[in-house]
Amino acid sequence: MMPPVRGTLTQGRILADLTWLRVGGPADWLFQPADEADLVQFLGALDPAVPVFPMGVGSNLIVRDGGLRAVVIRLGRGFNAIRIEGDRVIAGAAALDAHVARRAAEAGRDLTFLRTIPGSIGGAVRMNAGCYGSYVADHLIEVRAVTREGRAVTLPAAELGLAYRQSALPEGCVLTEATFRAEAGDPAELARRMDEQIARRDSSQPTKERSAGSTFRNPAGFSSTGRADDTHELKAWKLIDEAGLRGARRGGAQMSEMHSNFLINAGGATAADLEGLGEEVIKRVFQSSGIRLEWEIMRVGELPVNKE
């Protein structure tokens, strides 16, 4: 029995069309809260034994074909506000990273590193996303969140355990808002810089394909703060290339010809195709280099039940 809500609560919702890779089976339930109070009430009344999975826009996610045995919480319009207060940029967790970068730039505040990061602010914080030498950890002041028990809390950045492509947020904790400190900049110059970033990204990454961004973490060369070590040249895409896996395929899944660390749905892929190809890449890169790549894309859910 699910608690009453003011938002939308749907049983058995197929998640494929909510992920960038367009794969995935059904969630037991999908909850889209109306606002933070609705989320607090729902989690506070939900049976503690029921798993909860916060989901953003699905830009860095493979949901397995058997679906997800959990309540998936997906924030929407009630959580996408962006406001500027002095040197602080406060963004709802559902606000897109690119929108936050643009709004900040229009106000003369520099969060340009967010412009080409796919996804929403909640996911960016959870993964300590970064680009062009800047990471969320470099700018984040604090977040608002709702715990699995249904308590609204404010957490300083220092308590989030932000490191390279990861954080230590408690399981089931749903981020609702993030506050960043942003340096001043000329709006025209910030806009020009973002245009350059977009051009650079579009010339080197398969932005017109169905992908989930970088597939594997760069294997080394990052400090515990998540800041890049500029003296280290080891990159996942180089290891994949050296193993002869650029363009490798399994079913409808492919390692991009344009950028070999991008796993794409080339047409009709299942989650099993995508995850299976990724695991094959890990195996063959290890055989080639002795280095074991780690997934950057999150994989969740169950394998499909064999009905034969």
UniProtKB/Swiss-Prot annotation:
It comes from Cereibacter sphaeroides (strain ATCC 17029 / ATH 2.4.9) (Rhodobacter sphaeroides). The keyword Isomerase does not apply. Residues 212-226 have a biased composition (Polar residues). It is found in: Cytoplasm. Its cofactor is FAD. Residues 197-228 are annotated as: Disordered. This is UDP-N-acetylenolpyruvoylglucosamine reductase. HAMAP family: MurB. One of its GO terms (molecular function) is FAD binding.
